[in-house]
From Swiss-Prot:
InterPro entries registered for this protein in UniProt: Cyclophilin-like_dom_sf (IPR029000), Cyclophilin-type_PPIase (IPR024936), Cyclophilin-type_PPIase_CS (IPR020892), Cyclophilin-type_PPIase_dom (IPR002130)
GO MF annotation terms: cyclosporin A binding; peptidyl-prolyl cis-trans isomerase activity
Top EC category: isomerase
Name the UniProt record assigns to this protein: Peptidyl-prolyl cis-trans isomerase
Organism name: Hemicentrotus pulcherrimus (Sea urchin)
BP GO annotations: protein folding
Catalytic activity: [protein]-peptidylproline (omega=180) = [protein]-peptidylproline (omega=0)
Keyword list, A-Z: Cytoplasm, Isomerase, Rotamase
Subcellular location field: Cytoplasm
Chain segments annotated as coiled-coil in the UniProt record: none
Pfam families xrefs: Pro_isomerase
């Protein structure tokens, strides 16, 4: 099975930061990868375009994907509100890992995070479904606008996104 490539064009307070490219592991977690891919393209009538990274903690991760409430309490999947944890085969082994944010077991929606460090304590709790393949320097830039509380000093927006 193919591993789809998707992208985010990121901005900080309206200033272009650049593009990150991510490879989705549809070969391991097809349902989770398809959800993220379709939210990147917006083909279901909703998705990530125009949404923000609402929580950025340096040395940990950058979280986004709440395109309904924009504060970390919302979002929805292409399957309805929430969907089950597909599997925990892939691990949080390096910076750039793409994983699902959740509110407990089987509560995946649209929120995701990009690791900026090894986060092995999340293994078995969050579904890893891909990794950044280009633009880790852009993620480092985003990380620099974060804080220990997760509040960002600049508004980090997904200005455009899609599939390559």
């Amino acid at each position: 099975m193919a591993k789809p490539q998707v992208f985010f064009d990121l901005q900080a307070n309206g200033e272009n930061l650049g593009r990150i490219v991510m490879e989705l592991r549809a070969d391991v977690v097809p349902k989770t990868a398809e959800n993220f891919r379709a939210l990147c393209t917006g083909e279901k009538g909703f998705g990530y375009k125009g949404s923000t990274f609402h929580r950025v903690i340096p040395g940990f991760m950058c979280q986004g994907g709440d395109f309904t409430r924009h504060n970390g309490t919302g979002g929805k999947s292409i399957y309805g509100e929430k969907f089950a944890d597909e599997n925990f085969t892939l691990k949080h082994t390096q910076p750039g890992i793409l994983s699902m944010a959740n509110a407990g077991v089987n509560t995946n929606g649209s929120q995701f995070f990009i690791c900026t460090a090894v986060t092995s304590w999340l293994d078995g709790k969050h579904v890893v479904f891909g990794a950044v393949t280009q633009g880790l320097d852009i993620i480092k830039k985003v990380e620099s606008y974060g804080s220990d509380s997760g509040k960002t000093s600049k508004k980090i927006t997904i200005a455009d996104c899609g599939q390559l």
